């Protein structure tokens, strides 16, 4: 068996990056319920912040490659993380005009994009051998996904568990501070500077992957819709639902490494979307006793679907296009999440919750058909024929 000396995935530096990514996304996801509570349960303002944050992710994209080539990648992550923390602190200031809240949310998104681009698309690939990067990227993304349930629990559950509601602020910002510390302690190899244009699509947008991008939009839209509905339930119910979503994610992580290791490419996506569908149909029923299982199924479906879509993007990559593919996937998922979340704002008063779930189920059925009939054949035609590295 290879040791950490020959297998970078076992190295302390890579493990630090995985935990740093978990904590980084824990902070970002935890900010959603925190802002919802901070604004007195005003769902409209919270949605505006999410949309402004998403705009902030897009704005700096054309400068991504220039920033990480012109400056130290570690410094880009550290300073961007610090500045997004400053933006978050400013957001929590009482009595800010609404326009300032949205401007700060855009700034938060800008610094978040710079930080995640440095960490997920650049630093991790600098640490790994070419034969280890696909598995490394997959593991890093899984750690980031677990930030969703952990972030929400840090804000909604831990303060009540500890009997100290005043600790909510600290429990929100501690993950970000720990993430900064872990990356600061990571030894990152020096890389010769490469001359790049100030504005480019490198590490920002992979146009040839637009069918996969559209699939990300729809799949993440369902996730955003469901989580928006979850957040509007009483805190105790929200905590319970997030626990089961997290359990489903965890189950999907282990199932993927066993059941799908030698399976057909379509199997993981097919099962993930079927779990999506089953969860939405169960949630549309009035029997609350089956809802816990539905949320667990949804978490598992979300994990499997996102994992396979990322793998498709990586397999689509040509030479030196890995970071661009990763960022395109991230943008698709975050934009789709914001769209799905916003749908609830505009439809929640006019439609029943069960109607939204049935509509979501119909969208999933359509997505599954499009995937099997159009997207998967398209992918087989356009994927990188030289891709030969392990997935799990």
Q: Where are the regions a protein language model picked out?
A:
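Transmembrane alpha-helices of Major Facilitator/SLC transporters
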Residues: 57-61, 239-265, 272
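Cytoplasmic helix-loop-helix junction between adjacent transmembrane helices
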Residues: 106-142
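A late C-terminal transmembrane helix in Major Facilitator Superfamily
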Residues: 312, 316-353
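Glycine-rich segments within core transmembrane alpha-helices of 12-TM secondary carriers
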Residues: 132-156, 330-342
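Intracellular juxtamembrane helix-capping segments at the cytosolic ends
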Residues: 114-128, 303-318
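Helix-loop boundary and gating motifs at the non-cytosolic
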Residues: 2-54, 211-240
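Symmetry-related core transmembrane helices of the 12-TM Major Facilitator Superfamily/SLC fold
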Residues: 165-185, 355-377
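C-terminal transmembrane helical hairpin of 12-TM major facilitator-type secondary transporters
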Residues: 265-309
């Amino acid at each position: 068996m290879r040791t950490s000396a020959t297998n970078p995935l076992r190295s302390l530096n890579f493990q630090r990056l995985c935990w740093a990514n978990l904590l980084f996304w824990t902070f970002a996801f935890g900010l959603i319920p925190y802002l919802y509570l901070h604004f007195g349960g005003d769902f409209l303002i919270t949605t505006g912040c999410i949309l402004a944050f998403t705009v902030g992710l897009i704005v700096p994209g054309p400068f991504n490659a220039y920033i990480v080539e012109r400056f130290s990648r570690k410094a880009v992550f550290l300073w961007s993380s610090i500045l997004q923390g400053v933006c978050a602190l400013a957001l929590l200031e009482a009595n800010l005009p609404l326009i300032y809240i949205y401007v700060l949310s855009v700034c938060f998104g800008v610094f978040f994009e710079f930080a995640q681009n440095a960490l997920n698309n650049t630093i991790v690939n600098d640490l790994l051998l070419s034969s280890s990067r696909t598995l490394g990227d997959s593991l890093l993304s899984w750690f980031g996904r677990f930030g969703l349930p952990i972030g929400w629990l840090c804000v909604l559950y831990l303060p009540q568990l500890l009997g100290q509601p005043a600790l909510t602020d600290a429990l929100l910002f501690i993950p970000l501070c720990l993430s900064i510390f872990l990356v600061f302690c990571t030894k990152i190899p020096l890389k010769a500077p490469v001359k790049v244009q100030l504005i480019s699509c490198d590490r920002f947008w992979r146009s040839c992957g637009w069918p996969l991008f559209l699939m990300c939009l729809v799949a993440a839209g369902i996730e955003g819709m469901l989580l928006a509905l979850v957040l509007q339930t009483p805190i105790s119910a929200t905590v319970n639902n997030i626990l089961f979503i997290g359990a489903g994610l965890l189950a999907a992580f282990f199932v993927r490494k066993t059941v799908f290791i030698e399976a057909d490419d379509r199997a993981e996506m097919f099962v993930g979307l079927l779990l999506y569908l089953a969860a939405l149909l169960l949630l549309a029923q009035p029997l609350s006793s089956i809802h816990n299982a539905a949320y667990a199924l949804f978490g598992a479906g979300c994990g499997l679907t996102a994992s396979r879509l990322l793998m498709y993007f990586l397999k689509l990559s040509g030479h030196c296009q890995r970071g661009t593919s990763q960022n395109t996937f991230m943008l698709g998922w975050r934009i789709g999440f914001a769209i799905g979340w916003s749908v609830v704002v505009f439809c929640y008063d006019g439609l029943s919750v069960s109607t939204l779930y049935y509509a979501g189920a119909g969208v999933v059925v359509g997505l599954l058909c499009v995937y099997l009939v159009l997207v998967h054949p398209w992918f087989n035609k356009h994927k990188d024929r030289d891709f030969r590295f392990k997935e799990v």
